[in-house]
Amino acid sequence: MSSDTRPALILGSSSPYRRELLSRLRIPFEVATPDIDETPLAGERPAATALRLSRLKAEAIAALHAGALVIGSDQVCTLDDQQIGKPGTHAKALAQLQLMRGRTVTFHSALCLLDGRTGEAQIADIQTHATFRNLSDAELDAYLRLETPYDCAGSAKVEGLGIMLLERVESDDPTALIGLPLIALTGMLRHAGYPCFGA
């Protein structure tokens, strides 16, 4: 497959950070925002939530774009195997960070590449273990007022000031923590026959 015949590639996400990450690959892509219910199911394990939502996002966009390769992604933050969602408010964000300080949190960055030509879906859950610094309440409050990460799982906006919350990060994919694991994605694209280098 040459670069002239490759299928449309669509990122099913409203996240500017995922868009920026995908643009690093220098391949043409479009962006579409999926409209799905992101509520976890009763009794659903965190990794299962992330994988299910990444696939639902890809399927929602693929239904509107026949023959395209669609990327769906979702991230779930967990501590002691309990999901830590998007806080929504300053008070909830502060409570999350107080709970996580000095502890190691797992981020499940789920990825789905749905091939609209064949219906094949490749899925992966890339885990990142992030150890938080033991910061004071005043430092946590200052971070929240500067960054306002109320739409980020676990209140940790690591693509910005949130990186200062962390003491250590362990992952097989350095971009997974920001929300789009590029090592896994490029492997999926190659499996789908997509010419990542344009040849």
UniProtKB/Swiss-Prot annotation:
Named cofactor requirement(s): a divalent metal cation
Top enzyme class: hydrolase
Site keyed Important for substrate specificity: positions: 17, 75, 159
Keywords: Cytoplasm, Hydrolase, Nucleotide metabolism
Molecular function as annotated in GO: nucleoside triphosphate diphosphatase activity
Protein name: 7-methyl-GTP pyrophosphatase
GO biological process: nucleotide metabolic process
Organism: Cupriavidus metallidurans (strain ATCC 43123 / DSM 2839 / NBRC 102507 / CH34)
Family: Belongs to the Maf family. YceF subfamily.
Active site (record annotation): 74
Function: Nucleoside triphosphate pyrophosphatase that hydrolyzes 7-methyl-GTP (m(7)GTP). May have a dual role in cell division arrest and in preventing the incorporation of modified nucleotides into cellular nucleic acids.
InterPro entries: ITPase-like_fam, Maf-like
Pfam families, per database record: Maf (PF02545)
Source organism superkingdom: Bacteria
GO cellular component: cytoplasm
EC number(s) reported in the record: 3.6.1.-
Reactions catalysed, as given in the entry: N(7)-methyl-GTP + H2O = N(7)-methyl-GMP + diphosphate + H(+)
Cellular location(s): Cytoplasm
Tagged with keyword Membrane: no
